[in-house]
UniProtKB/Swiss-Prot annotation:
Gene: truC
Family under the similarity heading: Belongs to the pseudouridine synthase RluA family.
Membrane spanning residue stretches: none
Name of the protein: tRNA pseudouridine synthase C
Source superkingdom: Bacteria
Keyword tRNA processing: yes
Species lineage: Bacteria, Pseudomonadati, Pseudomonadota, Gammaproteobacteria, Pasteurellales
Residues annotated as catalytic: 55
GO molecular function terms noted in the UniProt entry: RNA binding; tRNA pseudouridine(65) synthase activity
CDD domains linked: PseudoU_synth_TruC
Record organism: Pasteurella multocida (strain Pm70)
Gene Ontology biological process terms in this record: enzyme-directed rRNA pseudouridine synthesis; tRNA processing
Annotated function: Responsible for synthesis of pseudouridine from uracil-65 in transfer RNAs.
EC number: 5.4.99.26
UniProt KW keywords: Isomerase, tRNA processing
């Protein structure tokens, strides 16, 4: 496959990560054969250095450095919360207006990779801003309810905890559609039955940072994939009017 390159200069490269693709090799997913890092390296004929990551089911802007020195400089910006990130998500229920979720999250340990790690750490600070963009009610019967409500929201994380956006939406009782770990399985099944969509509806739409060499502000945006476009069309939302 060929990855969509969103930005490239002598120091950096950014791609639109497809949903379902791992960023790099992991011994926890030994059966996988396609990874963003290896695919991009082969595509441009040059080694790339990861700066941050996106969960496997999440799509959108993914940034790499083209040298270890630039990678270290960019990683510092992420660590110091100098990078602005925004995501689009479709969630269950009506989530309107804007607000801030300030809800600490307990460190999540992997049963295999972290089996010797301490499981008694205090919850870590986790902050997410949200903005309701659009809503719709559809005649999809779920359990005893004859219709289902959905919202398109923009999510802006100010911290980077594991699965932060997915866990914060669950905390608000507005789980992200297609989330098999934190979402509503009945809602996910109904959505797939009526629309054919069966991915996590979470997309990293924008990344803003300071170029570590030129010191210019860089804004990188990623368009949504076909499943997103299909669902937006079914819900009769106008993505072009959303800024």
């Amino acid at each position: 496959m060929t990855l969509e390159i969103l930005y490239q200069d002598p120091y950096l490269i950014a791609v639109n990560k497809p949903a379902g693709m791992l960023v790099h090799r992991s011994w926890l997913d030994r059966h996988e054969t396609q990874f963003v890092m290896q695919t991009l390296r082969d595509q441009i004929g040059q080694h790339v250095y990861p700066i941050h990551r996106l969960d496997r089911p999440t799509s959108g802007v993914l940034l790499f450095a083209l040298s270890s020195e630039v990678a270290n400089l960019l990683c510092l910006q992420f660590e110091n919360k100098q990078v602005q990130k925004s995501y689009l998500a479709i969630v269950r229920g009506y989530l309107v207006g804007e607000g801030r979720i300030d809800y600490p999250l307990k460190v999540q340990l992997d049963k295999i990779a972290d089996k010797f790690a301490q499981d008694d750490k205090a919850p870590q600070e986790a902050v997410t801003d949200y903005l309701g963009l659009a809503k719709v009610e559809m005649p999809y019967c779920v359990k005893k309810y004859p219709t289902t409500r959905y919202s398109l929201v923009r999510l802006i994380p100010h911290t980077g905890r594991k699965h932060q956006l997915r866990r914060h939406m669950k905390h608000l009782f507005h789980p992200i559609l297609g989330d098999t770990q934190y979402g509503d399985l009945h809602q996910n099944r109904a959505l797939t039955t009526h629309t054919g969509v069966q991915r996590l509806m979470l997309h990293a739409e924008r990344l803003i940072f300071t170029h570590p060499i030129t010191q210019q502000q860089i804004t990188i945006c990623a368009g949504v994939d076909q499943q997103w476009l299909d669902l937006i069309n079914i819900f009769d939302w106008d993505l072009n009017s959303i800024h």
